[in-house]
From Swiss-Prot:
Substrate binds at residues 75-77, 113-114. It comes from Escherichia coli O9:H4 (strain HS). Catalyzes the conversion of (8S)-3',8-cyclo-7,8-dihydroguanosine 5'-triphosphate to cyclic pyranopterin monophosphate (cPMP). It is an enzyme of class 4 (lyase). The active site is at residue 128. NCBIfam families: moaC, PRK09364.1. The lineage of its organism: Bacteria, Pseudomonadati, Pseudomonadota, Gammaproteobacteria, Enterobacterales. One of its GO terms (molecular function) is cyclic pyranopterin monophosphate synthase activity. This is Cyclic pyranopterin monophosphate synthase. Homohexamer; trimer of dimers. Its EC number is 4.6.1.17. Belongs to the MoaC family. GO terms for biological process: Mo-molybdopterin cofactor biosynthetic process. Pathway: Cofactor biosynthesis; molybdopterin biosynthesis.
Length: 161
């Protein structure tokens, strides 16, 4: 079993030293969902929300969050991201919005936390913008979909997950 990388021999939290690692292209994809009433989703889709374009605002929030992950998550390295993508898709058949993010860089450490943070903050932004019309929306299923690059190798969720 793998060891926790952010815990030293004394059991204390520490930032991992990545100075000796090789720079490689690293990429991660994550997703999150915001489930809501059909009326709330229709308001977003139809552009009838009084606060403006919910998807555009959530997209910008997700991108900004990925760039600030190091400031939000203890022990994360500040990264020079070369790409952050936040895609939002209304799924009326499930009364939800699906958020999928992608982060990429050439560097010494992975971008999983950046992709997850982007998805989470985009979901939180949708909640924030819509809470006046529905407070019982559910943010859920935030997860890593795939990662590539780095010493630990590639990861991809199974198709049936």
């Amino acid at each position: 079993m793998s060891q926790l990388t952010h815990i030293n021999a004394a059991g204390e939290a520490h930032m991992v030293d990545v100075s000796a690692k090789a720079e490689t292209v690293r990429e991660a994809r994550a997703e999150a969902f915001v489930t809501m009433r059909s009326e709330t989703l229709a308001m977003i889709i139809d552009g009838r929300h009084h606060k403006g374009d919910v998807f555009a605002t959530a997209r910008i929030a997700g991108i900004q969050a990925a760039k600030r992950t190091w400031d939000l998550i203890p022990l994360c390295h500040p990264l020079m991201l070369s790409k952050v993508e936040v895609n939002l898709q209304a799924e009326p058949e499930h009364n939800r919005v699906r958020i999928e993010t992608l982060c990429r860089l050439t560097g010494k450490t992975g971008v999983e936390m950046e992709a997850l943070t982007a998805a989470s903050v985009a979901a939180l932004t949708i909640y924030d913008m819509c809470k006046a019309v529905q407070k019982d929306m559910v943010i859920g299923s935030v997860r890593l979909l795939a990662k590539s690059g780095g010493k630990s190798g590639d990861f991809k969720v199974e198709a049936d997950d």
